[in-house]
């Protein structure tokens, strides 16, 4: 299985793991724990205290408490894979809680997905300096 990392997923609305009666229906990998039906901020804090994850995955960050929990996770040595609704770097940098993170370069990559008229998805990747990386 290659690199073995402890991964935890906070799946507030069962949109990532699609858990049913506590069992993930999507393949989350052999070393992944899923916290289902728990708020993002609370879930991240519980996982940091009890599971010592190397990576925490969470979707749709938006509330101030989410950003505080991400900052705690980063300060505790976990990496965070998170999603945020934004169409481009300008829109992303205008989000209230992200501005200071972007200034501190807490993120290594920013990936923007765009659906084209033919149904295909176009991807744009930026580095921590907010410079576009060609894929």
For the regions a language model picked out, list residue spans one by one.
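P-loop NTPase switch/communication element
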Residues: 1-47
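Structural signal for conserved beta-strand scaffold positions within catalytic alpha/beta enzyme cores
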Residues: 9, 33-36, 82, 112, ...
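Switch/connector loops and helix/strand junctions flanking conserved nucleotide-binding motifs
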Residues: 16-19, 90-92, 119-122
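Short, low-complexity, polar/charged sequence segments that are solvent-exposed and flexible
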Residues: 26-29, 100-102, 129-133
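Conserved P-loop NTPase nucleotide-binding/switch module
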Residues: 51-111, 115
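Conserved P-loop NTPase
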Residues: 108-135
């Amino acid at each position: 299985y290659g690199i073995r990392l402890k991964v935890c997923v906070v799946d507030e609305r069962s949109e990532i793991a699609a858990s049913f009666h506590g069992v993930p229906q999507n393949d989350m990998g052999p070393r992944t724990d899923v916290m289902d039906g728990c708020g993002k901020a609370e879930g991240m804090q519980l996982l940091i205290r009890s599971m010592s994850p190397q990576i925490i995955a969470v979707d749709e960050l938006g509330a101030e408490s989410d950003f505080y929990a991400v900052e705690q996770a980063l300060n505790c040595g976990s990496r965070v894979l998170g999603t945020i609704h934004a169409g481009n770097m300008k829109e992303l940098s205008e989000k209230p809680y992200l501005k200071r993170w972007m200034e501190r370069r807490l993120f290594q990559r920013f990936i923007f997905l765009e659906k084209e008229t033919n149904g295909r998805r176009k991807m744009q990747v930026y580095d921590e300096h907010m410079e576009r990386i060609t894929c």
